[in-house]
C-alpha cells in the first residue's frame, strides 16, 4: 500500500464523514434564527393546574408592566415586573459578531423568533395570570420591587447582587420572587418565597419553560458567524436515568416528552451558548415538551404541588443558566451539564485534549492560535513512534514489490496459489501487510477528536491569532490558510515514494488534492491551522524517517 494513497484515502473518508455530518445537522433539524431583532416585551401567563401546556399570551400597553434593568460583570438583564421574568438578556463578555461592539443578545421576545426562559408558580387555590379580563375572576400577578429602583448594578467592590420582587395576593398571601446573581457567574438563582398569612392552607407548584421559535425553512443563525460547522442546535435534558439526552425540536410536534425525575435539568442548545433550567426544590419534577402556536416549542419542568399551612413559609428554588459552553463552569452548576458540549462519540479523547489545550493557553502565551500550534506539535511528537512504524512497514513492502510482481505474473491464472505464495513471502521477510495501515488507523481517532474539540470550543469564538486571522472559529476571509494547507498536502504527496505508474491514478491523486483544498475553504481558521501545522510536521518527520531508512537500505525513492 502506497503511503500517500493510503493517507489520502483515509483523509477522504474523514472529510466525507465531516461533510455528511454538516449536511445532516443542517437538514435533519430546523436551525433556529436567533438574530438580534427589535423586541417587543411580551409577558407570559401562569397556567392553571387544569391546563396541560403553558401557552404564552401577549399584552400591549399593560399598565402593570415596568422594566427593571440589572447590570453585572457578565449580564445585562431586563425584567418585567408584570411577570417577574427576564424579557431580555445580554452577555457582556461576548459580542454579536466580530465587528460589533454590541453585547450578544441571548434572550428576546420578538414574535417571529422567540428565545425565552421563564419560571413561575401556580396554586390550586388561586389562579394567577397576566390576563386582565376581570370576568374570568383571575387575579393579577404583578410585582413591585421593594426598593422602587429601576436599575440594579453590581458594584466593583461587591461579589453578589440580590433583589426581591413582591406580590401581595388576596387573603394576605405574600409572594416574593428573589433574584441572586454572583460575580463572574452565569447562574441566576431564582427563589420563590411564599408566606401564607391567610387562614387556610394553599398548594403551590413551581414550573419553568424554555421557549424557542421553529420554522419550516432551514435558517442559519447569525450567532454562528456563518461558520459551516453547525452542531446540534436542539433541546436537551438530564434525569435520574439518563445523564444526557438530546431532543429533536421537530419531534415535539408529534411526540411530547413526559418524564418524572428527582434530579436533572432542561436546556436549549446553540453552537456556543446554552440556556438551562435546573429545579432545586421541590425535588420531584416532571420534564415535558409542548408545541405552541404552530411555530414555537417549549421544553419545561413542573413540580408536584407542595402544601403550605396557614402561618407558614416555604421556598421554591431553581437556577437559570445562561451563557457560553464553558466546561469548568457548567459542571459546577449541575451534574452532566457540561455534556452539552458535543464532542461526539470520541468525547473520551476530545475532553482530555481540550484540557491540554486549556493548560497550554493558561501557562504559555495568551493566544489560542499559538496554543493550537503547540498542542499539534505535542500530539504529533507523541504519535511519532506510530508514524515511524507506519513508514517502516510501507518501506519494507515497497522493497518486496519486485518479488510480489513476479509471483503475480507466475500465478496470474491461479488465485489460490498467488495468495498462498504472497503470504509465504510476507512470513519469510517478516513483513505485516497491514503494518502500514494500522498505525494510521490508530491515529485517525485522535485527529477526529481534535476536529470535534476545536469546532466545539467557545474559547475560539472571536479569538484572534495573527495578521488577518481575527476569528479562529470563522473561515479565513482571504482563503490563504486553505491554500497553504493545499500546498503542504502537495509536498507530502511529492515527497512520498511511489510505485504508481498509471497516469490515470496520478491524475486522481492530483484531483483529490484540489478537492481537499476546496473543502477546507469554509472550515474554521483554527481547524485549518491545525491541519497546516500537522502537515508541516509530517513533511519533517518524513524526511527524518526516510533518511534513517536509507541507511538501512529500505528507502530508494524513484
From Swiss-Prot:
Known partners and oligomeric status: Interacts with the Sec translocase complex via SecD. Specifically interacts with transmembrane segments of nascent integral membrane proteins during membrane integration.
Name of the protein described by the UniProt record: Membrane protein insertase YidC
Biological function: Required for the insertion and/or proper folding and/or complex formation of integral membrane proteins into the membrane. Involved in integration of membrane proteins that insert both dependently and independently of the Sec translocase complex, as well as at least some lipoproteins. Aids folding of multispanning membrane proteins.
Cited HAMAP family: YidC_type1
Cellular component GO terms, alphabetical: plasma membrane
Protein family membership: Belongs to the OXA1/ALB3/YidC family. Type 1 subfamily.
Regions that span the bilayer: 6-26, 359-379, 434-454, 480-500, 513-533
GO MF term list: membrane insertase activity
Gene transcribed to yield this protein: yidC
Keyword annotations from UniProtKB, A to Z: Cell inner membrane, Cell membrane, Chaperone, Membrane, Protein transport, Transmembrane, Transmembrane helix, Transport
Pfam families found in the cross-reference section: 60KD_IMP, YidC_periplas
Location within or outside the cell: Cell inner membrane
Native source species: Blochmanniella floridana
InterPro entries xrefs: Membr_insert_YidC, Membr_insert_YidC_N, YidC/ALB3/OXA1/COX18, YidC/Oxa/ALB_C, YidC_ALB_C, YidC_periplasmic_sf
GO biological process: protein insertion into membrane; protein transport
Lineage: superkingdom: Bacteria
Amino acid at each position: 500500500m502506497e503511503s500517500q494513497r493510503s493517507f489520502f484515502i483515509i483523509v477522504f473518508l474523514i472529510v466525507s464523514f465531516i461533510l455528511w455530518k454538516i449536511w445532516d445537522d443542517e437538514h435533519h433539524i430546523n436551525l433556529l434564527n436567533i438574530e438580534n431583532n427589535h423586541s417587543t416585551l411580551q409577558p407570559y401567563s401562569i397556567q392553571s393546574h387544569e391546563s396541560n401546556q403553558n401557552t404564552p399570551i401577549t399584552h400591549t400597553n399593560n399598565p402593570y408592566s415596568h422594566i427593571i434593568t440589572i447590570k453585572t460583570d457578565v449580564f445585562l438583564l431586563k425584567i418585567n415586573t408584570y411577570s417577574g421574568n427576564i424579557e431580555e438578556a445580554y452577555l457582556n463578555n461576548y459580542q454579536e459578531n466580530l465587528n460589533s461592539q454590541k453585547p450578544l443578545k441571548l434572550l428576546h421576545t420578538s414574535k417571529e423568533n422567540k428565545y425565552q426562559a421563564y419560571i413561575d408558580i401556580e396554586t390550586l387555590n388561586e389562579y394567577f395570570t397576566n390576563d386582565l379580563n376581570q370576568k374570568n375572576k383571575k387575579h393579577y400577578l404583578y410585582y413591585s420591587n421593594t426598593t422602587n429602583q429601576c436599575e440594579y448594578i453590581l458594584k466593583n467592590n461587591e461579589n453578589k447582587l440580590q433583589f426581591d420582587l413582591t406580590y401581595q395576593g388576596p387573603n394576605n398571601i405574600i409572594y416574593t420572587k428573589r433574584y441572586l446573581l454572583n460575580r463572574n457567574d452565569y447562574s441566576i438563582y431564582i427563589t420563590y418565597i411564599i408566606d401564607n398569612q391567610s387562614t387556610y392552607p394553599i398548594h403551590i407548584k413551581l414550573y419553568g419553560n424554555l421557549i424557542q421559535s421553529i420554522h419550516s425553512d432551514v435558517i442559519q443563525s447569525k450567532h454562528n458567524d456563518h461558520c459551516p460547522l453547525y452542531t446540534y442546535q436542539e433541546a436537551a435534558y438530564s434525569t435520574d436515568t439518563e445523564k444526557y439526552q438530546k431532543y429533536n425540536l421537530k419531534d415535539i410536534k408529534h411526540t411530547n416528552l413526559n418524564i418524572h425525575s428527582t434530579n436533572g435539568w432542561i436546556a436549549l442548545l446553540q453552537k456556543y451558548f446554552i440556556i438551562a433550567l435546573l429545579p432545586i426544590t421541590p425535588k420531584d419534577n416532571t420534564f415535558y415538551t409542548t408545541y405552541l402556536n404552530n411555530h414555537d416549542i417549549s421544553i419545561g419542568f413542573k413540580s408536584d404541588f407542595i402544601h403550605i399551612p396557614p402561618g407558614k413559609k416555604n421556598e421554591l428554588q431553581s437556577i437559570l443558566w445562561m451563557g457560553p459552553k464553558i466546561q469548568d463552569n457548567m459542571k459546577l452548576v449541575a451534574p452532566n451539564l457540561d455534556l452539552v458540549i458535543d464532542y461526539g462519540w470520541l468525547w473520551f479523547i476530545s475532553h482530555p485534549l481540550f484540557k491540554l489545550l486549556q493548560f497550554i493557553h493558561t501557562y504559555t502565551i495568551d493566544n489560542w492560535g499559538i496554543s493550537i500550534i503547540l498542542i499539534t506539535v505535542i500530539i504529533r511528537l507523541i504519535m511519532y513512534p506510530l508514524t515511524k512504524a507506519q513508514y517502516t512497514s510501507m518501506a519494507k513492502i515497497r522493497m518486496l514489490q519486485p518479488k510480489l510482481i513476479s509471483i503475480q505474473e507466475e500465478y496470474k491464472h491461479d488465485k489460490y496459489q498467488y495468495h498462498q505464495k504472497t503470504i509465504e513471502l510476507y512470513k519469510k521477510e517478516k513483513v505485516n501487510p497491514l503494518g502500514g495501515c494500522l498505525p494510521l488507523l490508530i491515529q485517525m481517532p485522535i485527529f477526529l477528536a481534535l476536529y470535534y474539540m476545536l469546532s466545539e470550543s467557545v474559547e475560539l469564538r472571536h479569538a484572534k491569532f495573527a495578521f488577518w486571522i481575527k476569528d479562529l472559529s470563522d473561515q479565513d476571509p482571504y482563503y490563504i490558510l486553505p491554500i497553504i494547507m493545499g500546498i503542504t498536502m502537495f509536498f507530502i504527496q511529492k515527497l512520498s515514494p511511489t510505485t504508481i505508474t498509471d497516469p490515470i491514478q496520478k491524475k486522481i491523486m492530483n484531483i483529490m488534492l484540489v478537492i481537499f483544498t476546496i473543502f477546507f475553504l469554509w472550515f474554521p481558521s483554527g481547524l485549518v491551522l491545525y491541519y497546516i501545522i500537522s502537515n508541516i510536521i509530517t513533511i519533517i518527520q518524513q524526511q527524518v524517517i526516510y533518511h534513517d531508512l536509507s541507511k538501512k537500505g529500505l528507502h530508494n525513492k524513484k
